[in-house]
Regions:
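Acyl-donor (CoA/ACP) binding surface of acyl/acetyltransferases
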Residues: 1-33, 37-44, 79-219
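Residue-level detector of secondary-structure transition/capping positions
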Residues: 39-42, 53, 69
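Conserved GNAT-fold acetyl-CoA-binding loop/helix
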Residues: 46-66
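A short hydrophobic/aromatic micro-motif that marks alpha-helical segments and, especially, helix-coil
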Residues: 56-57, 72, 190
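Short loop/turn motifs at secondary-structure junctions and domain boundaries
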Residues: 70-75, 160
């Protein structure tokens, strides 16, 4: 993997529980690392993520990344690769950006090896503080399968509130799944504090001067 290329697309860097984590703008250079996780952890990820079934080759991953970057260039999506020591371990994103309703949805996933280490929570915490001003977003939503207990911890720990439960919201793995929707009014947010040290010292405006300032997890 070309670490020089990754460095050129760094969004933010922070520390969580003593480990250094980077969020990079999604790039083709991440495709092999991301697909390796999907390939190894396919059964686990497919329990909650319908797109895993369609991710059958490295070519599929590269095609998705190309699609994502095109949407980001149109400010329809904002997707980041979670890296630990520049190794891809997962993704977070803001998708379904609705400028009329001033709201958007958040998606995320991470390798089992890196769960429960604060990378997703701290990454989203940084993202939530920055992104709303760019997209004029007032409301963020997270949709979660009612049985995905680990995933529910993320919005709750960040101050999101459960707004509604929808029966038979999605069909995958041969059955219907009920979902819970968690919401956060970003102008009134009270994001829970977490131990995290930011290394990248830039003003918000600098974050969006990246030449391909792209605006999902695969949703």
């Amino acid at each position: 993997m070309d670490s020089t290329n990754l460095d050129s697309e760094l969004f933010i860097e922070f520390k969580s529980r003593g480990k250094r984590c980077q969020l990079f703008y999604i790039s083709d250079s991440h495709s092999e690392g991301l697909y390796e996780i999907v390939s190894i952890e396919r059964e686990r990820l497919a329990m909650w993520l319908p797109w895993v079934e369609d991710m059958k080759s490295i070519e599929n991953e590269r095609a998705f990344i190309k699609y994502a970057r095109e949407k980001m260039e149109r400010n329809e999506l904002f997707m980041l690769t979670i890296c630990v020591n520049q190794k891809p371990v997962g993704m977070i994103d803001i998708h379904n950006i609705d400028l009329q309703k001033h709201q958007a949805e958040i998606g995320y996933w991470i390798s089992e090896k890196y769960e429960n280490q604060g990378f997703v929570k701290q990454g989203l915490k940084k993202l939530i503080k920055i992104i709303p001003s760019k997209f004029k977003i007032d409301k963020l939503l997270i949709y979660i399968d009612v049985d995905n207990v680990k995933s529910k911890f993320i919005p709750i720990s960040l101050g999101f509130k459960k707004e509604i439960e929808i029966s038979q919201f999605e069909f995958y793995n041969g059955s219907y799944h009920d979902f819970e929707i968690y919401g956060l009014n970003v102008n009134e947010r009270n994001i829970a504090n977490g131990k995290s040290e930011i290394f990248t010292n830039k003003e918000q405006s600098e974050y969006f001067n990246f030449p391909h300032c792209l605006s999902s997890c695969k949703s």
